Amino acid sequence: MKVSYEALKQEFKRVLLARNVREDIAEECATMFADTTESGVYSHGVNRFPRFISQLEKGDIVPDAEPTKVLSLGAIEQWDAHQAIGNLTAKKMMDRAMEIADQFGIGVVALKNANHWMRGGGYGWQAAEKGYIGICWTNSIAVMPPWGAKECRIGTNPLIIAVPTTPITMVDMSCSMYSYGMLEVHRLAGRQTFVDAGFDDEGNLTRDPGTVEKNRRLLPMGFWKGSGLSIVLDMIATLLSNGLSVAEVTEEKDDEYCVSQIFIAIEVDRLIDGNTKDEKLNKIMDYVRTAERADPDVAIRLPGHEFTAIRAENKANGIPVDETVWEKIKSL
């Protein structure tokens, strides 16, 4: 089914207001959920909203909380989210990283006691739209086995890197082959994943999303490489924020909250003049796109370049929403 942007946003806002979220906060939060969904990231927009509301009702999310600065060391700052709404806080933290970068050329904000930020790519995009290189990542609850293990001990720990090209080039990836949100998208669509997503109960690689959702045996991206990347991202986020690690979130909390996050903005125009920057970026993009195709009918694309077209399509023709998800939201 298709739903208009405004209808989606108003439904999000209705549910938030019904839970006594302040009107201005409900408006901004609903807008961010609608923007994420319109951009085609359904897994962390409309599909994620019911779980977000569940955590709000349990008290994991404190809607009136505001992040506060704990420590400033020039280009690096520590902040405490106080369990505020994740996507609103993340947006503020990337804005702050850009402000610091305006002074020092680079800005780093390390955040503790944060909630799930929903679409992490939105914050990299936020920086790149204003001409900065945007880098951010978060740790999580333990939802993936380290390489060689059966038991979940590491996070998917999404990493985002966005570069101010035209259109914006952005990698937005978890350290697993698939996030749980994308597994849900495939399951709801009744299809297998395109590549192996995890292990079945016998330890064999599988593309069945439901199996991996149930047994929690996600496949790390690049096998041992994704496992290792997850671990070091967790270490850095924990140290810079003085916040909780994956191990601590998992052992001390009953759900995924009070996570640690990093936001980095780099003012690249201080390092290279505009014309040279554009020439170099266009050279890179053209060199990649003009490689001989493995399939003549399938164009080579750069990461993130699809979002502009997806958003335009959804704006013109309505946003695809799974009927069961929509009915769930309507019932909240």
From Swiss-Prot:
Keywords: Cytoplasm, NAD, Oxidoreductase. The keyword Cytoplasm applies. It comes from the Bacteria. Transmembrane segments: none annotated. One of its GO terms (cellular component) is cytoplasm. NAD(+) binds at I168, T169, M170, V171, D172, M173, S174, W224, K225, G304, H305, E306. Its EC number is 1.1.1.130. Pfam families: Ldh_2. It catalyses: 3-dehydro-L-gulonate + NAD(+) = 2,3-dioxo-L-gulonate + NADH + H(+); 3-dehydro-L-gulonate + NADP(+) = 2,3-dioxo-L-gulonate + NADPH + H(+). GO terms for molecular function: 3-dehydro-L-gulonate 2-dehydrogenase activity; NAD+ binding. It is found in: Cytoplasm. The active site is at H44. Belongs to the LDH2/MDH2 oxidoreductase family. DlgD subfamily. Catalyzes the reduction of 2,3-diketo-L-gulonate in the presence of NADH, to form 3-keto-L-gulonate. Homodimer. This is 2,3-diketo-L-gulonate reductase. The gene is dlgD.
